[in-house]
Amino acid sequence: MVSVIDIQKIYEQWLKKRNELHYKSRYDGHEQWFHGSASGMCMRKHYFQHVAKVKPNAVDVNALRLFRLGDLVHGDIQESLMEYASLNGARILIEREIQLPEVNVRGFLDVVMVEDNALYDIKTCNAWKWKGLFGRTPDTNLPENYYLQLGTYGWWYEKEYGNKLKNITIKTIQG
């Protein structure tokens, strides 16, 4: 009798392992830092993570699948922008780690087109979110913390490069 592998289970285990490796590579040894992407989040969330050191719940596999789709879309967009920059002689920052030690914030900005002084953050969304943003009766108001996150990265950029940003954009893409 031929045994049948459980493809979904194998994929879910792979996603969990990949997420764990990603977390370790980015955040291990940096636990004392607040995250740029957590700007504007509930103070209780910050307290439990940074003061009480409560370990968060495991991420649901459905969320891991959405994260993976977002990673793939981010990767494609970033690769296309790097190609654009290469062909046009443009300077670009992609997935750049930033640190603001005076406020203990660390994060990773998505894209800066340096010559244009333009900062972009790419947000993928699921079908439900997309329908709310772009459907028949759209509500284009993004969560406030998206803007605060982008403002944090903008603060770093202006401090680091001494240039005022001319454009700060959140680009929402259906994943």
Predicted features by range, described:
Residues 123-124, 169-175:
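Short, structured patches in soluble enzyme cores that scaffold and shape functional sites
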Residues 1-119, 126-137, 143-144:
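Metal-dependent nuclease catalytic cores that hydrolyze phosphodiester bonds in DNA/RNA
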Residues 75-83, 138-172:
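Metal-dependent nuclease catalytic cores in nucleic-acid-processing enzymes
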